[in-house]
Amino acid sequence: MKHIALLGSTGSIGTQTLDIVAEYPERFAVTGMTAHSNMELLAEQIRRFRPQVVAVGSEARRAALAALLAGFDGMPEMFVGEKGCCTVASQAPAEVVVTGIVGCAGLMPTLAAVDAGRDLALANKETLVAGGPVVMPRIRARGVKLLPVDSEHSAIFQCLQGVPEGALKRILLTASGGAFRDWPVEKLAEATTADALKHPNWVMGAKITVDSATLMNKGLEVIEAHWLFGLDYDRIEIVIHPQSIVHSLVELADTSVVAQLGWPDMRLPILYALSWPERLATPWKPLDLARVGTLTFKEPDHERYPNMRLAYQAGRAGGTYPTVLNAANEEAVAQFLQEKVRFLEMSRLLEATLEAHKSAGEPDLDDVCGADRWAREHVRWLVERSPARVLI
């Protein structure tokens, strides 16, 4: 039996992780949960999975959750805020922590889990993008296992099983191309929030769906792959694969290319991260390549996806530039989801913020947190300057 602390239980990764736990009750149990604001769903999850500790976003939400659980005989101990999330990550009786919190909010709980010696099933790419220089040395020092949950990084991890050290030559990260992959580039100026949220293949949360439309999700994954697999940025490439069947590929020293294929279903990488090094049998529909028929690949269009260039630029620059890229993107996407900026303005906000930043050379945690705060404030300042914003 593997015991799990689940950070972000009411989000997309969290609910699918609980689907796995429900499907394999003899293998997995949830001992800790965190959720920011969806107390109704969290209450349902607590009644079903009976965690011992939970954390929520505020004192008011703790009171609301307690009211929803009135009379429940398995009332968990409750904590509040970021400190509460860190408590669940570090003190819930668990062998593995699933980090399903979206954005840089997952950084501190992830560090708390690492410092407590917990293995990580990492679904939060922003943790390594923003905090790679801080997180990875701690992971190595503590000797914890870091198992990727992102479908692309899980695919790479699976492809590398049994590959001798030093044999990895190149990583090819596949991207669906997002909601606007078939739109004329000149029409992107008219793209709405509703348009951006219509992902052609995957069912995901709003933020990552917008990131898919801008290809920022892939840019962040390039930086994450750099930290996970130790390759220079020149050896990590992005390829558009509209069918989302090949989840990523690796090229080895002898030019062999190994790929991992499957239907676009996040439950598979979640299950692999939880069960590794085993592979558990599933009742899920197997991949039928004859039914799929055709798999296509093409280079990404830099004019359509300017965020891709910004991600490589920030990754190569290092320091706190990736932190600023990530934080500025989170704020820009939030502004877009609130319909305060247009689709094409997001990349302009990111570029302007990166240009204004002065990076710390070898950042510590204070540098990372400071750069994160500065970038968010700078994007808000740019948006508030004027309706024209001199970015258009």
Curated annotation (Swiss-Prot):
SUPFAM superfamilies: 1-deoxy-D-xylulose-5-phosphate reductoisomerase, C-terminal domain (SSF69055), Glyceraldehyde-3-phosphate dehydrogenase-like, C-terminal domain (SSF55347), NAD(P)-binding Rossmann-fold domains (SSF51735). Transmembrane segments: none annotated. One of its GO terms (molecular function) is NADPH binding. NADPH binds at T10, G11, S12, I13, N38, N124, E126, G205. Signal peptide: none annotated. The keyword Manganese applies. HAMAP family: DXP_reductoisom. NCBIfam families: Dxr, PRK12464.1. This is 1-deoxy-D-xylulose 5-phosphate reductoisomerase.
